[in-house]
Each structure stands twice: as structure tokens, then as C-alpha cells.
Design a protein with these regions (language model features):
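Bulky hydrophobic segments
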Residues: 1-98, 102, 106-119
Length: 119
């Protein structure tokens, strides 16, 4: 269910939150400032969304044989959804968003691997 909601939000032409909060789908609410490392930018909104999504997935599948499939799926989803922004009206592909998506998955997977190591 969470996966379906994420896909709807990502593929919606414009910002659903902007539409409801500001009555303008062209405005994207910003949770915190994006993370900047010299010339390297990571979208904070995308990072938080994929941390949330990855955490839900890991919690749901951590004791099953599907965990490796889930991790690969999350990485693939984080890339494909951002690439689709090239084809959706009022959306655009941005490397900072892609890096935020991927880093959200990476953070949760690293924490999961550390936890598994010390169980």
C-alpha cells in the first residue's frame, strides 16, 4: 500500500502537497534545506521519503528470504521513479533528487546490515 502511494506522489504532474498547502501544484513544500557538499547537492525531501519507505520495507521483510529482493527493488525504484520525471508534465529530472532517493535507501540498508551483524 505504501508503495502505491509513493508511486502516485512521484508520478503526479506537479506537487500534490503544494496543491493542498498552497493551492498551487507548482510549489513543492520543503521539509528542510537540501544537503550541500561543495558542488554536490542531495534533496532532503527525497532523502526523507526513501528513508521512510526503506524503513517500512526492511521492517516488513527483515526476517524473510525476500530481503535481498527488497533491497534491490528499493534501489531500482529510487532510480526509475526519478527518471520518469523526464516524461511527466510539470516535473523534471534532477540529480539532487536522484542522489536523495539513493542515499535514503543506502542509509537504511547500512543501518540494517550493522544491526544484523551485531544480533
Amino acid at each position: 500500500f505504501t508503495n502505491l502511494i509513493l508511486i502516485i506522489f512521484y508520478l503526479f504532474p506537479g506537487s500534490i502537497f503544494g496543491y493542498f498547502l498552497y493551492d498551487n501544484s507548482y510549489i513543492q513544500p520543503q521539509i528542510t534545506k537540501d544537503f550541500s557538499f561543495s558542488d554536490f547537492l542531495i534533496s532532503s525531501n527525497h532523502l526523507y521519503v526513501f528513508i521512510f519507505l526503506s524503513t517500512i520495507g526492511i521492517l516488513a521483510y527483515h526476517n524473510t528470504s525476500k530481503i535481498n529482493f527488497l533491497i534491490n527493488y528499493l534501489f531500482l525504484l529510487s532510480i526509475i521513479l526519478e527518471l520518469f520525471h523526464n516524461f511527466i508534465p510539470n516535473r523534471g529530472f534532477e540529480f539532487s533528487d536522484l542522489f536523495g532517493n539513493i542515499m535514503g535507501v543506502v542509509v537504511v540498508v547500512i543501518l540494517y546490515k550493522i544491526k544484523k551483524k551485531y544480533e
